[in-house]
Amino acid sequence: MCGIIGYIGDRDSVPVLLKGLRRLEYRGYDSAGIALLQDNKIAHLKKAGKVSDLQSLVDDSPIKGNCGIAHTRWATHGEPNDINAHPHLDQTGNIALVHNGIIENFNTLKEVLIDKGVLFTSDTDTEVLVQLISVLYYEDETISFEDAVRAALQWVVGAYGIVTICADEPDTIIAARMGSPLVLGVGDNEYFLASDASPIVGHTRNVIYLDDGEIVKLTRENHVISNIFSKEVLIKTLSEINMSIEEIEKGEFPHYMLKEIHDQKHSITNTMRGRLNLDDGTTNLGGIEDCMPNLLSASRIYITACGTSWHAGLIGKHLIESYAQVPVHVEYASEFRYRNAIIDPNTVLIAISQSGETADTLAAVIKAKEMGALTLGICNVVGSSIARETDAGIYTHAGPEIGVASTKAFTAQVTILTMLALKIGRKMGVAKDRGQNLISALNRVDDDVQTILDSSNFIKAVAKDTMHTDNFLYLGRGINFPVALEGALKLKEISYIHAEGYPAAEMKHGPIALIDDNMPVVFIAPQDETFPKILANIQEVKARKGIVISITDKPNRELKSLSDYVLEVPRTHQHVFPITSSIILQLLAYELAVLRGCEIDQPRNLAKSVTVE
């Protein structure tokens, strides 16, 4: 993986492709490359490093053509270097291919091809695929390039989103998908292909989302989508991209992450818009209305996700069990799909994914559906694979999230789970005034977020005082333990400081051995029933000279006296506190990363959307 862009039309493809790659940088990558048809030959350039390095290559060795493909790579097979960068060419130099995904049986295929005399130049699984297409194409003079691609894909075990061109058919692009997303942009006598919609925005709003097992042949004039295996031609309707150029640009902010932290004063409200019913103390979630009887009769609920979305799921567990009194199990999708989970028709699986393309989460959905469970999706990207695969779902409407470290998508997911828990709870007899109290607090969130953003100078001061430490510990209790986990993850992701999140009471069972006068310990300390216990934990840290940073919505005299720093959020409902307190943790991680000179929006080794298993 990580980013694909293709173009065919009347324009020079180079500016389109390079601009598309820049739009895909947020996904994370280690190299970039471009290939196009120039004078009926493949011209290509690729380079380890940034898209700007590739741009310099293009400036030094200009290439031009109306049909081309480009790629940003995040290494899975083979180290990040010029040779392993995409696009990959076959040994004739007539076929170029870019690929997201993993070819699981590439070693077996490679041995077959070596026996046929194929010489490999890279260490990647992708080169195996382009060489296989080449052998099948040139061994049979009667076969078309499209059918050679089809034939090659019959051999492949694994996941792929591929886009390929051939000098023998110079006005054609072939693309196919199995487990890795591809979006087809439909313009006026031109087409675009991309791994997500962001490179297409500004060129056309009309798109078609390819499904697994589909292949598309593009010329300047038309497109034909068919099934890879049966060759059945498919008629698919156009969808409209629901994002604007402004949403995917930084504007006045130095980094996307900071922009998206500030976006939360509006994005959380957008998530709730039209969904809160204060009079009845409930929520309106049209996307799941038809399956409410199944939800109400569920014997168990699984929440499955990865990374930040998993932390949102842990918060959702507390909320659903509190309001609906239904047992909830939260599982990493990568673990859930490989174990013998108890699933029957009375089971509900909720899959959470910002992109809607997370490979392990999608696989967990498919497994649960096969076993008879009702599946629900909580996604940000409209038309994504998980949104289409699940039986029903709720969009977060947080707007595009470009920074690799999730911010506004996380708070949107928690907001959705809060509304879902309340909706189920009210149907099952939760008192109306209890729902009204929660909704009143949700209605104040935009003001609360603004208050937090206004306190960012003090957060900068805390970051400055702690920037040279090597380790952080984040502690919370109950519903705020997942907040501690998320705070630690944010810090690790973008500042490269080692951090761990722990239940506060578990500190005594190991982590307390690490605490000294160089260890900042962040306490999530709301004024709820756990507050006296949190104070006791803080005293244990102070006794060992730890640096205490407390996040609270009501600092009392004792908390202030025990804490080196107190970061305050506005007083709010205990089930809204995880939303507001997480924003302070996002700002703290951001300021520490800035002071340490880290790459904020594209942290090392990370990808925004993990579309491989």
Ranges and model annotations:
Residues 183-208, 334-368, 506-542, 572-586, ...:
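Glycine-rich, anion-gripping cofactor-binding loops and their flanking helix/strand elements
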Residues 154, 264-302, 371, 382, ...:
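Active-site phosphate/pyrophosphate-binding segments
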Residues 1-250, 254, 269-300, 338, ...:
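Conserved short alpha-helical segments that host acidic/polar catalytic motifs at enzyme active sites
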Residues 293-430, 435-444, 526-569, 588:
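Glycine-rich phosphate-binding loops that contact phosphosugars or nucleotide phosphates
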Residues 257, 547, 560-562, 572-613:
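Generic C-terminus detector
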Residues 156-190, 467-493, 528, 535:
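Acidic/histidine-rich
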Residues 66, 70-83, 279-293, 316-352, ...:
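Glycine-rich oxoanion-binding loops at beta->alpha junctions
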